[in-house]
Amino acid sequence: LKPGNISNIINQASFLAIIGVAQLVVILTGGINLSIGSIMALSTVLCGPMLVREANVPVILPVFLVILFGAAVGTVNGLMITRLNIPAFLATFATMYVARGAAWLYIGKGVFYGINDQIRFWAMGELVNLNGFRITMPIVLVALFLVVMWFLLAKTTLGRRLYFTGSNPVAAEFSGIP
């Protein structure tokens, strides 16, 4: 393997690492989220038209909308699980297929061309080239995200509560952890 190949693999896996850490938090609490990939796809499809050069939309708007949409769907999943007492597997399974179907209906067989240069930099921009090993923006962002999540899970009360709740919810409740 050459340094360029390794950096390319890390760059492409960076998006999956973020999704994986988000899924880790869900699994720590004893749950499961099957819809995470489909929600990511639907978010991308819905905001794709705003990311083309001709749209003249500030990059922060689609990014904010993707985060807002993901949080809204996560809230719906959470309400189905906690208020309607639907098992997490079934609730997120249903959401997965609704999101997948909506993305397919919305995009059809279309493709977005001419992505905005700002978003292209955030998605693929090279910051440093160390003898063929390219450090790109996604690598830096995922490294920052991993450090923040490590700190949150390992060094904060919230992180300890997540671990305790997932390992034994009854014992966690008796210990005063909601």
Regions from the PLM with identified roles:
Residues I9, L16-A17, S38-L42, I60-L68, ...:
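Hydrophobic alpha-helical transmembrane segments
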Residues L1-A55, L79-I86:
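Single transmembrane alpha-helix segments in multi-pass membrane proteins
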Residues S35, I60-L61, P87-L90, T157-R160, ...:
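Residues that define the loop-to-transmembrane-helix transition and helix capping
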Residues A88-T156, P178:
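Transmembrane helix-bundle core of multi-pass membrane transporters
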Residues V21-A22, L42, L46, F64-V76, ...:
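Generic alpha-helical transmembrane segments of integral inner-membrane proteins
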Residues A55-M96:
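Alpha-helical transmembrane segments within multi-pass membrane transporters and channels
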